[in-house]
Amino acid sequence: MWLFHTLLCIASLALLAAFNVDVARPWLTPKGGAPFVLSSLLHQDPSTNQTWLLVTSPRTKRTPGPLHRCSLVQDEILCHPVEHVPIPKGRHRGVTVVRSHHGVLICIQVLVRRPHSLSSELTGTCSLLGPDLRPQAQANFFDLENLLDPDARVDTGDCYSNKEGGGEDDVNTARQRRALEKEEEEDKEEEEDEEEEEAGTEIAIILDGSGSIDPPDFQRAKDFISNMMRNFYEKCFECNFALVQYGGVIQTEFDLRDSQDVMASLARVQNITQVGSVTKTASAMQHVLDSIFTSSHGSRRKASKVMVVLTDGGIFEDPLNLTTVINSPKMQGVERFAIGVGEEFKSARTARELNLIASDPDETHAFKVTNYMALDGLLSKLRYNIISMEGTVGDALHYQLAQIGFSAQILDERQVLLGAVGAFDWSGGALLYDTRSRRGRFLNQTAAAAADAEAAQYSYLGYAVAVLHKTCSLSYIAGAPRYKHHGAVFELQKEGREASFLPVLEGEQMGSYFGSELCPVDIDMDGSTDFLLVAAPFYHVHGEEGRVYVYRLSEQDGSFSLARILSGHPGFTNARFGFAMAAMGDLSQDKLTDVAIGAPLEGFGADDGASFGSVYIYNGHWDGLSASPSQRIRASTVAPGLQYFGMSMAGGFDISGDGLADITVGTLGQAVVFRSRPVVRLKVSMAFTPSALPIGFNGVVNVRLCFEISSVTTASESGLREALLNFTLDVDVGKQRRRLQCSDVRSCLGCLREWSSGSQLCEDLLLMPTEGELCEEDCFSNASVKVSYQLQTPEGQTDHPQPILDRYTEPFAIFQLPYEKACKNKLFCVAELQLATTVSQQELVVGLTKELTLNINLTNSGEDSYMTSMALNYPRNLQLKRMQKPPSPNIQCDDPQPVASVLIMNCRIGHPVLKRSSAHVSVVWQLEENAFPNRTADITVTVTNSNERRSLANETHTLQFRHGFVAVLSKPSIMYVNTGQGLSHHKEFLFHVHGENLFGAEYQLQICVPTKLRGLQVVAVKKLTRTQASTVCTWSQERACAYSSVQHVEEWHSVSCVIASDKENVTVAAEISWDHSEELLKDVTELQILGEISFNKSLYEGLNAENHRTKITVVFLKDEKYHSLPIIIKGSVGGLLVLIVILVILFKCGFFKRKYQQLNLESIRKAQLKSENLLEEEN
């Protein structure tokens, strides 16, 4: 049942999400009726605290007044025209209204035409109303040059005694912009009135066609009229002509209607036939009044009317009196010019008659020429006198299109600052005007920097104006959104009596209209400007989304620094964010100024309906303006059919009567008023009984939960009578196994309807242990109780503004229920954990190192340490072998768990309480014989506890890892070369490497072959071979090589091979040449080819460094050369002599005789035996 009750309670509530403008109950001005709203603002009379909604309107038949004041009457907005506001004649092109505690200033830009001016003028008329909206002063700027005083005082830069005047906290502006201008259709009568207001100039030419004029002179008169009309048509687009010829008869050659066709009118002039006879000048002038300047012949009531009389003599036989015609009522307002041709006008009577025809003064209206050929010399002078040439096509414009009052600020009870955006060819400027003296001083950039006049042209300076309250001074600023096509903000600076605008901030994107809207903000409401918001509503990303730049003002020198950039919802293009901005006062009720920014085209063209436009609310903080909006109000959520929602806005005053600041937002044709919602800030408290849990406690805990409003207002009290506070309790937050819980789940989710004693609400709750023992594992850490809360209100309740919790205060509070601890009557037990660790070695060689030992000594020299834990982080290539633990305290460790690239082993030391004691632990790891990817790794020991004031001890050891390998070079060997067996020898030098390389260590084999000895090239390397494809070899010529410095060698051939395998044979084939080297061989007996293994010792460890060097020695063998012929001859001669001597001695001894006889006997015996054998064979 309680669950159903809770769900029903929640379902009947509407969550209050928007902070903190109430969009559920807006008020709108009547749609389709008077007035048609262009802009709106709120104004309050300080003397009576009466607040009105002021709206501006275009000039129509239904809304004749440009300003209306509106009030809330029985939940409806009723509007009435503000009386005694002068309405200037002409077509209204814009209305600007600003207010301060000094009053209200309304300026109307009016399109008018001066008499005989060739072009229209767009200037302003301003009316200053008092705080009670009674008229105080009026200023008309049609003749601005006569109102200027270049020596008028400018107060900027001086200390200003009253900072309230013109301050950003009580000045709100609203003005109609061209981009959103869409006036109601006007009645036909009004259109006719406006046409007459721009009716132009009507010129009636009266030509003397009497008989006293010769035909050639009459033709010259017609040519003069043609040239005059053609000359005027080129400059004056609104000039119309009529031509009347007089003599014996008076006839209209063509009237004002016919002159619309320029070429036809010029042709008619040339086709005129002279009528002759008498000179009826007075009758001809009366004819123009009766038959030309009438509406039936194309004349407009408010057009400027001019007569040009061309005659060759005095009046003759005219029935009408000239004086009577001149003084007739129809002649009033008609300017007359007279041209007398001929000698007759030298007489006094005829001259007086000519002056009577012309208007005063005669110097500029009566002309005399001696003959008709001299008429063309009068054209330029006549044109200048008839039509004022200032402001004509091609000429520079000064104040004709100034639009005085396009933007405005009230400075005090007599001075105003008015933007003149169109002055000086739209370079713009500002007018500092004194409403009492009716004098002003024009301020612009051109006067200050004539060299930069080209950049100033068309910059629209004065599009927006504002006043900054700097430290003990005022500063006038003006926006120029087209300055150098990027836009800029100008600040008025003084040098002596000179004052001019100079740029201080410039836009960053072409066409962004940077500076079109300025909004000074006094965040802390101390009277000094803290920030300046500068809008660039056409800033382009995908479309013209717009953005706002927030600049901070320096308190020291008043300089600007960019604080942040604001932008609207990224999903909308062409939103024009920043089109309007306003400081809204303290909407969030934190004594800080809030700001509203409009995006009137956001959602334009969307499919969800005809409403479009949004307003963003940004709250002020002590360190500045918030970076994100607290609320986005869309037109579609307010009312259907609202267009350009956010084109103007203002706030800061209470029109609804609830004591809170309200705001108004302008849309096309209507104004919307929103009330702000009371902001509630709650102070939450919680009391526990018992205040601390004893060890082994198994009872219930009484909880007293109270909510107290820290800031009570009438609106908040009224709203809280109907609001509900929904709160939720989360007991033992952050614990996987909770030790306490609510005795009844319903008591942890409450719908509270009544507040006790107005500002405080309390509730009693019960907490009880969960199933099992209350203190099974964690009996020492506090039990955290989190209270989350929110305000809710019944749906459809709009009688009072709905309260809302402060957006910037977390809607929850956390309270701690501690356990009792034996800590010498102190609130917290403070343990003092000390950790000391050592490792058996810092450098480990994979493949060589077998074990690593870490000794850990943990000491608690303080009070009890609860739930003491030790975390041991070590690299994965260390495998736990054994762990030596003391018998006391008890240490229990979990199995290591892989986390990322390490293993973590968690140990519980002396759980639950580690008393004052020490523990020594030894951890032994075995190093895996696998390649380790990193050069270093850390072993980290971290010890923590669960005391309220946690203790933390940790130590880290960094291990250096290298990988071992075995590489053996073949033993040194000797080779022999017989240098006497030819001039060159081909040799191959083999370097054999073998060993064990389990971890893919890369090492280098360097072979050094001496090639040049004493400047002679002895050895040339021909070829290099290797057996492994992975081996990469390079070679170069070096002057020194390897580890040995061998004498006589000047150059080496160095071969470097990178090897990563177990075995490799590298063979270097070379050619040894001895040509021209006989002298060298006298001193050089051998060559040494060197071989050496090297490697990166920071990565690898060579396990047999004694076998990393070898050499191959080449020994040279040398043969002696002898002259053999003399020795042979001498030996032969000596031998013969010795033989002869021996023979002589033997002969004398009879040696040869006995021997010879024996030989002969043996020969005879052999012959006989042979013969006997032959005979036997034959037989």
Swiss-Prot record:
Sample GO molecular function, one term: metal ion binding
Impact upon substituting F316A: Loss of E-cadherin binding
**Induction data:** Integrin alpha-E/beta-7 is induced by TGFB1.
A GO CC annotation recorded here is: integrin complex
Where does this protein hold Ca(2+) 2?
Answer: D586, S588, D590, D594
From the UniProt entry, list the residue stretches annotated as the region Disordered: 158-200
Task: Give me the residues that bind Ca(2+) 3, please.
Answer: D654, S656, D658, D662
Keyword tRNA-binding recorded: no
What do we know about how this protein assembles, alone or with others?
A: Heterodimer of an alpha and a beta subunit. The alpha subunit is composed of a heavy and a light chains linked by a disulfide bond. Alpha-E associates with beta-7.
Q: What is this protein called?
A: Integrin alpha-E
Species in which this protein is naturally found: Homo sapiens (Human)
Lineage runs: Eukaryota, Metazoa, Chordata, Craniata, Vertebrata
Q: Which gene encodes it?
A: ITGAE
